[in-house]
Amino acid sequence: MLHVAALTLLAVLIAPTPPDEQIPYDAAYRKAQEEKKPLVVLVGANWCAACRTMKSETISPMNSAGDLKGVIFTHVDKDVQPEIAQQVMQGNTLPQIVVFCEGDQGWKRFSLTGMQSERRVKELIRKASEILPLRR
């Protein structure tokens, strides 16, 4: 019985965090700095159909497949957190997927605007990750 409990706990600990249960922006930013990982922010709104679709049909499958394990992911609702959304976004189009990476020359911003496929988001994350210093 103890063996089953240990395996269950292990499965919970190593499973990716679903996008619906992501950490708040401020905590995600700190975690990205501490772990030297890209910060991926999906900016959207509940009323935005493309935002809901992108979250469920792009981000959620990527998370389930482990494609987000090398990044820190968070979601910012433009209506709930307008100040943070304004800082992160460029323009007013929703959704926006923004990736921040800290390289040798400081933080860089990469983004896509509008509904995006898994392929495009993966390409954006890969491109942003190329500026990360090599870990030894």
Question: Which residues make up each language-model segment?
Answer:
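Non-catalytic, surface beta->alpha helical segment in thiol-disulfide oxidoreductase systems
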Residues: 92-136
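Active-site-proximal beta-strand/loop segments in catalytic clefts of secreted hydrolases
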Residues: 43-46, 76-79, 102, 114-115
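Conserved redox-active cysteine motifs that mediate thiol-disulfide chemistry
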Residues: 43-57
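Thiol-based oxidoreductase modules, predominantly thioredoxin-like and allied folds used
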Residues: 19-22, 59, 63-83
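A short beta-strand-turn-helix
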Residues: 21-37
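Short pre-active-site segment immediately N-terminal to redox-active cysteine/selenocysteine motifs
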Residues: 36-39, 44-47, 93
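Sec-dependent N-terminal signal peptides
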Residues: 4-13
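Electron-transfer interface patches adjacent to heme c in soluble/periplasmic c-type cytochromes
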Residues: 85-91
